[in-house]
Each structure stands twice: as structure tokens, then as C-alpha cells.
Amino acid sequence: MLVIVGESASGKSTLQNMFINANPQYKKVITYTTRPMRKNEKNGADYHFVSVQEFESMIANNAFVEYTEYRGWYYGTAKADCNGENLVAVLTPSGLRALKRYGINTISVYLRFDRRSRLIKILQRGDEIDEAYRRNLSDYGQFNGVENEVDYIINNYDYTHDPQQVLEMLSLAITAEGKKNGI
């Protein structure tokens, strides 16, 4: 499974969608959340948006490889969605660690993006300024040291790489890992 990690508004989901569009044999892992949908999000495409009661029932039934509560909302990756080949997931560092503990073979990429540009993107997508600052600070702690946990790092400060270049980097990473692991 290709796992893309990166702070809020670093371009993870955009990169995931671009990669899948360029490589249709890959399938998006759609995670679950109890948070409200943002404008332009679609249930079953961006997330599985479920109620707290549904999510807690899934926890009780051991349906998740990993889940977390973040600012009052649940987020999680279902075990059933991690079966198969050619999967691409967008996760937090703790989500990546959980997949590895569960025994899922991963190729992990950290999409590094500068704080100022991320803050601007968060505000542009309509988040409140207090929420934007809070997310930026939270990411700082959560992603501290992630460079040592991933297989590859893509520095994408100020969009210096064009999308095609980033896709090529991902493809090279997958090819290299496949050869290394006999895939």
C-alpha cells in the first residue's frame, strides 16, 4: 500500500487523486470520519462520513486497523479497505505506524510543505483562522520526526515541483520498493 503522509493542506489528497488518475490500476483507500463534510466533499469519495454512533459501533466490532479522535471527531481506516493490491492511502504518522503494526506492507511518502503556504491554503479552503492556526500547531507536534519513519520524502515547498514531476517521483519510489521487496 502506498501511504502518503503530510500536514494539513500539504496537498496529500490532491496528490493521491492525481496519482490514481495517472495510474488507474490503483485504488483510493477511503477512510471514515465523524466530522462534517466540507464544501465540495462527497460521501464515499473523500471520506465515509458516519455518525459517532456508527463509528463507535465499528470500534466495538474491531473493524478498524487504526482510528483516532482528533478535536472531537473520529477518523479511522477500516480493515476491510486495506485488503488487496495497488492501494493508496492518505494517513497521519500514527495511522502509518498502525498499518505497519498490523503487518500491512507499505511504501510511505512524506509530502513536506512549508508552514506559511499550508496556512494560506487552509484559509483559502474556508477554515476559520483560529482553526487554521490550531491545525498548524497540532501538525507541528504530530509530524515532528516523521522524516525518520517514512521511506521517501518529497519536498514540495511553494509548489516548486510540477504535478508530473511529483507523480514521477512516486512511480520511481514504488518501482524501487517493489524491486527491493520482490514485488
Language-model features: where?
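Conserved phosphate-donor/acceptor-positioning beta-strand/loop module used by diverse small-molecule
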Residues: V88-T92, R101-L123
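P-loop (Walker A) phosphate-binding loop of NTP-binding proteins
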Residues: E7
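Small-molecule kinase domains that catalyze NTP-dependent phosphoryl transfer to phosphate-bearing small molecules
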Residues: D127-I183
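ATP-dependent small-molecule kinase phosphotransfer cores
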Residues: T33-L87
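Post-Walker A helix-loop "phosphate-sensing" segment adjacent to the P-loop in P-loop NTPases
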Residues: N21-V29
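Walker A/P-loop
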Residues: K12-S13
